[in-house]
């Protein structure tokens, strides 16, 4: 089947946030809610997890492989010499406290660390433990969530004022017509964030030009959030905690569409210390499972990332792209020559490959597609790119 001509891909929606695939998600919360323990079990690292505020001062950064049964299946089929999954970049940020936007605690330094991230794991504590102090004196995850939201909101309000003042000076009083649209857009942002007291991400009708301006300033409330609720081991196993319903109701009302994922840092730490066989027995005996795979996948998706596969006996690899990436740009992730000389993308859907059992069987079933440069790559596509070089045509 020849590659489809122009128009074989819809225009992808604009995305608020930094452009690229090396994006980071930061673990944010009050001190002593379990952030460093979570970071340790997530990344198998040993960041300090002491029982006092601000034990994490410089953010710890690591990357974790994204678990995917599709990747595992392709590796089983091809038995490749090299296996490279997709990765999620995770940053452990020190605990925020009330008044951080005014410099309380380690204040502005922490907020700048959040600014350097592209998404947020908002971790809150819903377990009681007399040995672990709470910076606010009691366990109340709703209050804690609201403190974090307020600090991010107030920091954005603090940032917006000087931006508008500068634009007004140049675009309005100075008559710079090129900057007038940006000034108008920032006034709209001010109305939403400051006057209506709403985060940037809650407004779903930003147009392309507005998103372009938002991406220039990268406000904290524009960053997507995944809410992680740290439970005791007992509560996690029995799937019961007095705060869970209240947290879900708060998020549904205040951050509609955001995910709430319960987990237990204590359980995950215990599982990590067991052998693989002991871990499996423990999980089966307690009829439970680790929440980490779900959390990693949720963080990856929150950053608007996905991946396609290249697969063969030499290598099975997941190539990370932003949602909405077209075939030539996806090819460029492998090598710039692939994008410059792009001819077509030969695409198999993962489910078709799994159902049919081989590439030849997919072709025989008429499910092997040749796509042109307007094709928008879909998550899990298995792709072979054809491209031209000055010397010859090649295929990978």
Swiss-Prot record:
The TGS domain is annotated at: 304-387
Task: Give the modified residues of type N6-acetyllysine.
Answer: 294
State the encoding gene: Ola1
* Domain of life, per lineage: Eukaryota
- State one molecular function term (GO): ribosomal large subunit binding
Q: Where is this motif: Nuclear export signal?
A: 267-274
Write out the function statement from the record.
Hydrolyzes ATP, and can also hydrolyze GTP with lower efficiency. Has lower affinity for GTP.
GO terms classed as biological process: ATP metabolic process
* Name of the molecule in the record: Obg-like ATPase 1
Organism field: Rattus norvegicus
């Amino acid at each position: 089947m020849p590659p489809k001509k122009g128009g074989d891909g819809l225009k992808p929606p604009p995305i608020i946030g930094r452009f690229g695939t090396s994006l980071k998600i930061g673990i944010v919360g009050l001190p002593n809610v379990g952030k460093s323990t979570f970071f340790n079990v997530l990344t198998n690292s040993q960041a300090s997890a002491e029982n006092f505020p601000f034990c994490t001062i410089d953010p710890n950064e690591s990357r974790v492989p994204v678990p995917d049964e599709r990747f595992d299946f392709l590796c089983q089929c091809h038995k490749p010499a090299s296996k490279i999954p997709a990765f999620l970049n995770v940053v452990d940020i020190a605990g925020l406290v009330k008044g951080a936007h005014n410099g309380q605690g380690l204040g502005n330094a922490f907020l700048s660390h959040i600014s350097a991230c592209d998404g947020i794991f908002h971790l809150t504590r819903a377990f009681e433990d007399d040995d672990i102090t709470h910076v606010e004196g009691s366990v109340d995850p709703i209050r804690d969530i609201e403190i974090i939201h307020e600090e991010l909101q107030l920091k954005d309000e603090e940032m917006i004022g000087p931006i508008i003042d500068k634009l007004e000076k140049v675009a309005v009083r100075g008559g710079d017509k090129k900057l007038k649209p940006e000034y108008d857009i920032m006034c709209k942002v001010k109305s939403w964030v400051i006057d209506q007291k709403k985060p940037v991400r809650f407004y779903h009708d930003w147009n392309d030009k507005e998103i372009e301006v938002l991406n220039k300033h990268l406000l904290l409330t524009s960053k997507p959030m995944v809410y992680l609720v740290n439970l005791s081991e007992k509560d996690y196993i029995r799937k019961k905690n007095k705060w869970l319903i209240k947290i879900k109701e708060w998020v549904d009302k205040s951050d509609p569409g955001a995910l709430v994922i319960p987990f237990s840092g204590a359980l995950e730490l215990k599982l990590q210390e067991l052998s693989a066989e002991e871990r499996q027995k423990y999980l089966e005996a307690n009829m439970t499972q680790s929440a980490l795979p779900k959390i990693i996948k949720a963080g990856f998706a929150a950053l608007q990332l996905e991946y396609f596969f290249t697969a063969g006996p030499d290598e099975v690899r997941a190539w990370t792209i932003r949602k909405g990436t077209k075939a030539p740009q996806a090819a460029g992730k492998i090598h710039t020559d692939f994008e410059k000389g792009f001819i077509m993308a030969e695409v198999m859907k993962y489910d078709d490959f799994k159902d049919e059992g081989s590439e030849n069987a997919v072709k025989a079933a008429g499910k092997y597609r040749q796509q042109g440069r307007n094709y928008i790559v879909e998550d899990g596509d298995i792709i072979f790119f054809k491209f031209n070089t000055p010397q010859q045509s090649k295929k990978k």
